[in-house]
């Protein structure tokens, strides 16, 4: 009998300087899709909205079998089943850990992944990375994740628990940064043309351009990406 539970999981996230739950890795940017922040964050004028390339779901497998050795065996067998199933499933991959602090399954031994939860429960955390298909809705993406978890056979008393927090992600953030820089450059030229002239040139100064691109969710599968820069104008030719 399949045991699939949906609960409010504890959120493990990294807050970005812009006050949104965000994780930046070299090859991707991840933002928590249902993160709510009461603080007002200043968003620069220039930004772009892109569709998420993937969604991350946290899944916890737990067992309450009496024997600790039996619990470890159940979780090890379940983990093998899940990872092998993911290898055969298109557009779904598995990592160990939590969104933003996950790693490839090859980087850790199963004994290192199993965590004791009290005296009579043990568990293991994984991350499902589900690629977003063309014209797919968020509900459709989540349905695929839920089906993957539901259809994976479980060993012994293992239960599957899907967290209620998801992370939207974009791959290759470098290409989006290049798009932003070009747009900001055009905005600088517009400022100079609008407020200056041959007799009174305008100097435009930018600060913060060295920072990494930031994101915030603006739709079920949409992310706004921006560089947290600031702009200042000064009239006169260096005066």
Go through each PLM region and give its residues.
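N-terminal signal peptide c-region/cleavage motif recognized by signal peptidases
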Residues: 14-18
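Sec-dependent N-terminal signal peptides
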Residues: 4-13
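Generic short amphipathic/hydrophobic targeting helices enriched at N-termini
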Residues: 7, 19-20
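Short, charged, surface-exposed interaction patches
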Residues: 22-189, 197-239
């Amino acid at each position: 009998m399949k045991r699939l539970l949906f609960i409010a999981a504890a959120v493990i996230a990294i807050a970005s300087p812009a006050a949104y739950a965000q994780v930046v890795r070299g090859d991707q940017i991840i933002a928590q899709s249902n993160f709510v922040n009461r603080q007002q964050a200043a968003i620069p004028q220039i930004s772009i909205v892109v569709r998420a390339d993937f969604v991350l779901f946290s899944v916890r497998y737990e067992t309450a079998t009496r024997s600790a050795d039996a619990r470890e065996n159940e979780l090890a067998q379940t983990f093998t089943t899940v990872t092998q199933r993911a290898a055969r499933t298109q557009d779904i991959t598995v990592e160990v850990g939590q969104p933003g602090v996950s790693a490839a399954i090859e980087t850790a031994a199963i004994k290192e992944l199993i965590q004791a939860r009290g005296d009579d429960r043990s568990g293991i955390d994984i991350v499902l990375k589900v690629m977003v298909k063309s014209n797919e809705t968020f509900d459709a993406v989540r349905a695929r994740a839920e089906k993957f978890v539901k259809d994976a056979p479980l060993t012994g008393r293992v239960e599957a628990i899907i967290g209620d927090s998801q992370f939207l992600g974009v791959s290759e953030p470098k290409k989006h940064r290049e798009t932003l820089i070009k747009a900001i450059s055009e905005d600088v030229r517009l400022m100079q043309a609008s407020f200056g002239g041959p007799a009174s040139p305008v100097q435009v100064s930018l600060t913060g351009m060295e920072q990494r691109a930031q994101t915030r969710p603006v739709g079920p599968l949409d992310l706004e990406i921006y560089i947290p820069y600031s702009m200042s104008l000064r009239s006169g030719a260096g005066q």
